[in-house]
Amino acid sequence: MSTEASVASKWTRPDDFIKLQRLKQKKNKLAARVSNNNNRRPRHQVDETDKSKLLEAKLAQKRKNPFAKSTADAKKLRVDPQLADLEPVVTASSCFVRETPTRPAPAKFVLQKYDPQAFAKLFQHPQINAEDEDDAELAARQKHTAHLPVDWSLKTRARFFCPTELPAIQLKTSQLASGLTSFVRCMDPQRTESTLDISDATRFNQCNYYWQHPHLPWLTLYPRTAKENVGVVVGERERKALAEEWDFSFRGLFQLLRARQCPYFYLCANTFTVLFRAAGVGGRPESHALVTPSTRGMRQALRQEGIEFSMPLKSDNSGNAHDNSFNEESTTTSLGPEAGEDAPPPAQEDEDDDEDWLESLGVDERELRRIQSSHARKQQAAEMREDFSDNSLLLVDGVECQGFFSYLLNAKSAISTVGRLAGVPPTLLSPVAFPKATMQHLVPRSKKVRLDGVDYFSIDIKGLILPTFLPSVAELLSETRQMFSSTLASSINTLAFSKATQKLLETPETPQSDAEGEDAAGQVFGEQNLSECGLLPAVVGSICRTGQHAVGLLERVCYQRDEGYAWS
């Protein structure tokens, strides 16, 4: 037994062998670390038989950079000594330094003799810098008026600034209900005896509503060219239902306009926009319509239907004879039917005389037809030159407005069959209720901004803004605030409405001596006839105003109680 125990003790167990191996590795690592720290030897003496030592030595050595490049073989710039003497070497760094502006040398401070009148001279001859000159020019361009002009273009955004707090947009239950009731019933809470709330927040909420038809929540019906409308398909059954609803709504809205129960409304199609206005609005004694933009095909279709129109913004300056012939032809469209039937247009007589003269000279009939077709193409090109521009605006006035209404009601081109919103009727927009209409609401957002070290309260409104919105809000703020300002963004397609109205007011048909009296009388009768149209009396007075600065394109409006309105 003793011999077996001695033999067993000579054998090494596997766990003991592993412990010895690990202990040996730790000793080797410690020795290598000490040798590296003390720099006793420049390089490790590696035993090739020990794999662990080889791995440690490989890790301890510094890895060679594979991208290193020898500086001995580097390329050097060859410099010709003769050229070096003639001109200096221009490098990228020297160009950069040379082109970079440097700070000018400080001016010398020189003390001058005391002048007792120097301070007084500063007040007599003030120095004006470039910013002051720009402010002076802007102040000169701004027009100060006691009233705010009306802008007949549709707005897409409005922002109001005021140093004092603006009306609250977080409404209470009574304020929301009172504003909604006042708008639907066309009431002025301040002038009628009622229990409705008359706070500023309620009145401001009343200004944010308008009526629209049709209303499809998943589509953007103004502007009708919005990106969200791409790929929208309307079925045949839906198209028929929308057309029937729109027909009934358009008829009812136009009847309200003729009865002066609606002051104005917009018809927004894919390719044109129409503004219908009641009698007395914009200085016109009868109901009328403004169409922008128009095309040669549309004007030709109106002529074929016997609808007379005029183009108030059309430029009269013509550069050639073809434009003159077109101007003469366009002016004949505004003549009465009797004048057109009694005598042919002068342009047509001239063309007949020219043809007879060419035939008398023996010109071939084929050549004559070629000349006639060339002349007709030139006339068409001259007539199409102003298509899709503000100058192509059409004015349909008086009894012709009824014919134009029937034309839009039956025209197939009013409802687009292809493209965006195919099959969706034009959008009808009105400040008062009409059949099949849906009430819409502008959502204001308030915030506090800091400009030039001064805190301002701001209200930002995004959406479709009708022309009567700004006069209503301005009337409210002018009563309760000392000063405020507003910036507006207009829809480009409707700028021609304000331009045409302004030009029609500046060129009256009556003589200058009788114009002022008739304008004042027309304004009074217009306000009286539109007293039941559903708008506030101050707003009715602004849209019926015919004096100076009655209409204008508004981008920025400032108000101070002592000076009035300044706008540009």
From Swiss-Prot:
Main localisation: nucleus
Disruption phenotype: Flies display a distinct thin-eggshell phenotype.
Ranges that cross the membrane: none
InterPro entries referenced in this protein's UniProt entry, alphabetically: Donson
GO annotation, cellular component aspect: nucleus
Statement: the UniProt record of this protein carries the keyword ATP-binding: no
Residue segments, region Disordered: 28-48, 311-355
Any one of the GO BP annotations: nuclear DNA replication
Bias kind Polar residues: ranges: 315-335
Keywords: Cell cycle, Cell division, Developmental protein, Nucleus
Locations listed in the record: Nucleus
Organism superkingdom: Eukaryota
Function: Essential for DNA amplification in the ovary and required for cell proliferation during development.
Protein name: Protein downstream neighbor of son homolog
